[in-house]
Amino acid sequence: ASGGIAQSFRLDVSSEENVKNCLDSIAEEMGEIDILINNAGTTTVGLLDQTDSEDWDMVMNTNLRGPWFLAKQWVSRRKEKNLTGGNILNISSINGEAPQKGNGVYCVSKAGLTHLTRQMAIECARYGIRVNTLSPGYMRTDINKEFLDSETGKDFIKRVPMRRYGTPDEMTGPVLLLVSDAGSYITGSTLIVDGGHLLSTL
């Protein structure tokens, strides 16, 4: 945005101490955060009965514990400083709404994140803090475009009723709705943006 300032901070979301220190650093340099978007994520591939505990912990620490650490510390700071209002937006996935063979740990972590949203929405509403989830379907990005252009990817798209993948730009409107005054009466909700994918099978 015109006149805005963007700054990056290194953060290990799986460490609560690191999260706390990072929020301290941000506050010192830029002031308190009004909108927290939890978007860190990772995955591993395999059936649940063949998944080792290290892979399970890696995914859960990033996809579920991390957002909880950030939300917990962020809410605590606002309470301590008597700040009202603010928004938390957790980026989940349609995999949090429906299972997918071979992607079990990720699905479980995202389902947990979606329910974390609901629980925190109940607990934070009295402070004017809204907590919501955005659950995208498959988005075409530089990371996955090679797969999506493959024969397997082209076949996979047949499962999407709109017969195309989404683009990162198509996330702008949903994000703005959930974190701006346009969505001032929305909390504890999950907005699915998937081209109708969940209407068919994953």
Where are these regions (language model features)?
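Active-site loop immediately N-terminal to the catalytic Tyr-X3-Lys motif
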Residues: 48-49, 98-104, 126-127, 163, ...
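Substrate-binding pocket helix/loop in short-chain dehydrogenase/reductase
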Residues: 47-48, 55-60, 144, 156
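Short, small/polar-rich loop/turn modules that mediate ligand/substrate recognition or access, typified
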Residues: 125, 130, 186-188
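Active-site helix of classical SDR
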Residues: 71, 109, 117
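Alpha-helical segment proximal to the catalytic Tyr-Lys
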Residues: 76, 122-123, 184
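Residue(s) in the substrate-gating loop at a strand-loop-helix junction
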Residues: 93
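Short C-terminal tail/terminal secondary-structure segment
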Residues: 98, 176, 187-202
